[in-house]
Amino acid sequence: MKLNKVHHVAVICSDYERSKQFYTDVLGMKIKSEHYREKRDSWKADCFIGNTYVVELFSFPNPPARPSYPEAAGLRHLTFEVDDLSAAVSELDSKSIKHEPIRTDEYTGKQFVFFSDPDGLPIELYEK
C-alpha cells in the first residue's frame, strides 16, 4: 500500500459551536464547507489551513467523553507546525488559552508547546 499523506483528522465535539469557534478564532482555520446531516442529527465542518483540508469537526447528540491524557491508548495529540513559536504562544496568551511551558525537543532542538481544545484534546504547536 502506498499512502500519499494524512487527508484529515476527525474530531467529535461535545459543544459544536464552542469547538468551531476555537478551531477558527484561536487556531485560525477556515471552514470551507459546513453541513447539517439530518439523519444523524449532526453538524459537519471541513476546516482548512490555507488550501489544505486538516480537521473535520462533528457534532453528535451527547457524545461520551473520551480520555485524552497523553498515556491513553489511541490518538495522543494533534500537532501543527508554526514559523514562530514565541509569537504563537503570545497569541494563545492574548486569547486566555492556558498552555504548558515551552519545551525543547531533545532530538531536534526545536521548541514546542501543548494546550488543549475545548474537549481536552491535546494540541501541540511545533516550531518549523
Features from the language model and the residues they span:
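Core segments of cupin and vicinal oxygen chelate
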Residues: 11-54
